[in-house]
Regions:
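Non-catalytic terminal and connector segments of soluble metabolic enzymes
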Residues: 1-140
């Protein structure tokens, strides 16, 4: 298992003022923040990042949402980082998420679900590389 994962604090959570609270959850869960950037995704960036969903019916709504305001992209480090982060954030649909997970506490629906988390070590590496140069990552 890898020791890095990628996360996004999505525009809904940033707009609601929950960035700091989610940051606290990241630290409490034992993650080291290797790098973080606050940015507003361009349409081109969002389409590139979510290209895997291009044929899905929700793609245009997803792109519109992800470009609607600032978000925070993060490279996180911890043993078994991908599975640990996914456990910390909870199910994609906040209605199905366990109590005390980020999505249960901060998300409003399946699309505006506060955070993104990589689903595999391979995708974590790709997603980190999409937003961060090697020199921007600080190991613990």
């Amino acid at each position: 298992m890898g020791n890095k994962t990628f996360a996004i604090i999505k525009p809904d959570a940033v707009k609601a003022g929950n960035t700091g609270k989610i940051y606290d959850r990241i630290i409490q869960a034992g993650f080291h923040i290797m790098s973080a950037k606050l940015l507003k995704l361009t349409e081109e960036q969002a389409k590139g990042f979510y290209a895997v969903h291009e044929e899905r019916p929700f793609f245009s709504d997803l792109i519109e949402f992800m470009t609607s305001g600032p978000c925070m992209v993060l490279a996180l480090q911890k043993d078994n980082a991908v599975s640990s982060w996914r456990e910390t954030i909870g199910a994609t649909n906040p209605e199905d998420a366990e109590d005390h997970t980020i999505r249960k506490d901060f998300a409003s629906n399946v699309q505006e679900n506060a955070v993104h988390g990589s689903d595999s070590d391979e995708n974590a590496e790709k997603e980190i590389a999409f937003f961060f140069a090697d020199g921007e990552l600080l190991s613990n």
